[in-house]
Amino acid sequence: MIIGIGIDIIELNRIEKMLDGKLKFMERILTENERNVAMELKGSRLTEFVAGRFAAKEAYSKAVGTGIGKEVSFLDIEVKNDERGKPILITSTEHIVHLSISHSKEFAVAQVVLESSSR
């Protein structure tokens, strides 16, 4: 059973501006594992990567109904890719998490669907 849905869209140029102070912003948004991946990227690919993770984490927080804040922080959520490149959201929830991330020339968008783990 679906118990939550969240979606977030972010302008890539907004993230690009925040990446000027690259390390501080990335430390606030990305886990250590995500930062390690990000450090290997440059230019528009770095912007897309960070924007996609930002949108995914915001979408997850909306799906659980709290938003980013006291109960859920950016660092409580990690996005990895499986062996085929599919984004996987890692968090402490018991629920099944479905994540989709997409980019265009100007935007990154992510959608999260939370499903009850009991059938």
Curated annotation (Swiss-Prot):
Cofactor(s) essential for the protein: Mg(2+)
- Where Mg(2+) is bound, by residue? D8, E58
Q: Which GO terms describe its molecular function?
A: holo-[acyl-carrier-protein] synthase activity; magnesium ion binding
- Which segment of the chain is annotated as a signal peptide? none
Q: What is its EC number?
A: 2.7.8.7
Q: What class of enzyme is it?
A: transferase
**One Pfam family this sequence matches:** ACPS
Gene Ontology cellular component annotations, sorted alphabetically:
cytosol
**SUPFAM superfamilies, A to Z:** 4'-phosphopantetheinyl transferase
**Record has Cell inner membrane as a keyword:** no
Q: Name one GO biological process term.
A: lysine biosynthetic process via aminoadipic acid
Looking at the keywords, is Oxidoreductase present? no
Keywords on this record? Cytoplasm, Fatty acid biosynthesis, Fatty acid metabolism, Lipid biosynthesis, Lipid metabolism, Magnesium, Metal-binding, Transferase
Q: Subcellular location, in the record's words?
A: Cytoplasm
Q: Which catalytic reaction applies to this protein? A: apo-[ACP] + CoA = holo-[ACP] + adenosine 3',5'-bisphosphate + H(+)
Q: Which family does it belong to?
A: Belongs to the P-Pant transferase superfamily. AcpS family.
Q: Which NCBIfam families match?
A: acpS (TIGR00516), pantethn_trn (TIGR00556)
Job description of the protein:
Transfers the 4'-phosphopantetheine moiety from coenzyme A to a Ser of acyl-carrier-protein.
Name the chain's protein.
Holo-[acyl-carrier-protein] synthase
Q: Which organism is it from?
A: Bacillus cereus (strain B4264)
